[in-house]
Amino acid sequence: MTLTELKHLYAHQDLVEALVEPSINNGYIVEFRHRHGGLVPLTDIGGSEQCYGDVDSATQQAFEVGFQQVRIADEY
């Protein structure tokens, strides 16, 4: 989902957790846990998962959605 779509879900309290984890593309992805279960990835408008070069850049995207805390997943 795009940043705008995720902000909408957050505003309606449908997202309960933000997660940054390593990507197979040597970067970091941002996912959000939906209140009904499952993870929702941050994507571009074409539906491709967004990958960031460092943890701080990825974390900033979760903050943009509205979260004040972000869980950073281990690389192992």
Positions of predicted regions on the chain:
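Short aromatic-glycine-(Arg/Gly/Cys) micro-motifs in beta-strand/loop hairpins
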Residues: 21-47, 67, 74-76
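A short, charged, amphipathic alpha-helix used as a generic interaction element across diverse proteins
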Residues: 53-67
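Negatively charged, low-complexity tracts enriched in Asp/Glu with abundant Ser/Thr
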Residues: 1-11
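An N-terminal amphipathic alpha-helical segment
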Residues: 9-27
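Short secondary-structure junction motifs
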Residues: 15, 67-69
